[in-house]
Regions:
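Structured extracytoplasmic
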Residues: 1-97, 103-109, 173-248
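Gly/Pro-enriched, hydrophobic low-complexity segments
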Residues: 85-88, 93-192
Length: 248
């Protein structure tokens, strides 16, 4: 699973960051997804996460009783039908479009639009929109095509908006599932741009590339400046701390 993220912080002139994660996904005894982070590169200081609480929204259980762990009632589970209103429009090629609206205003329900097979009801695409824990989110999902994979997302994209104390934060996330195994499972939260380039399923756009270039150029300038003015022992302590701190 790869999760590239970009953050736009309105306060302070529009600061932008980008992070990418490459995770190994497994299921625990209860069938809950468990992620082991193999790679992690980021322009956020100390490789911290922004809006980390919304990352769980990237592994929705569309057909489950709740979409995200214990939060948000799925409109596609039979037990939750009483909480939603549905409108169906027939489409060509044996497809139908379903519009879903909450019967009552509540943070545990959402609006949704899905493309389904008219005969089987299998969902091929679905969009969700809602608000939970002070975060407004918009999620677009492409489901897997065949067999057991059709019950889970193949690709999930999300935009999340959060406002707090005058700061407006926007996070844009894309997760791709079912990537071929290329790297060793022994990796643990490694910051390696070369390895990330090998597994990245979606090429970086120009804006994302520019963010990385500015970050590494600035870090090089700081490192060069410190090398010229302070002992190397202090350089290792002060400059590399943000890289290794997460692994201590």
């Amino acid at each position: 699973m790869l999760v590239p993220t970009m953050y736009a912080v309105a306060h302070g002139g529009g600061r932008r960051f980008i992070s990418e994660y490459y995770n190994q996904m497994t299921l625990d005894a209860k069938g809950k997804p468990v992620a082991k982070r193999l790679l992690n590169i980021s322009t956020i200081p100390h490789r911290s996460n922004t809006l980390s609480s919304v990352l769980k929204y990237m592994t929705p259980t569309v057909y489950g009783e709740t979409l995200f762990e214990t939060n948000i009632l799925s409109p596609f589970h039979q037990k939750n039908r009483r909480y939603y209103k549905y409108a169906v429009t027939q489409l060509p090629f044996g497809k139908a479009q379903i519009y879903v609206y909450p019967r009552l205003k509540n943070t545990q329900v959402i609006e949704a639009r899905a493309i389904v097979d008219s005969k089987t009801g299998k969902i091929s695409m679905v969009d969700f929109e809602g608000e939970y824990d002070m975060t407004r989110f918009y999620i677009s999902i492409i489901m897997g095509r065949d067999g057991f994979g059709s019950l889970s997302p193949a690709k999930c994209s999300m935009r999340a908006n959060f406002s707090f104390l005058g700061n407006k934060i926007t996070g844009m996330y894309t997760t791709v599932y079912g990537l071929p195994k290329i790297l060793s499972d022994s990796l643990n939260n490694v910051a390696d741009t070369t390895l990330m380039a090998k597994v990245r399923p979606i090429e970086l756009n120009q804006e994302e590339t520019d963010i990385y270039n500015r970050f590494y150029e600035k870090r090089k300038q700081v490192a060069d400046s410190l090398n010229n003015n302070i002992p190397k022992t202090n350089f290792a302590k002060d400059i590399l701390w943000d890289v290794i701190g997460d692994n201590v």
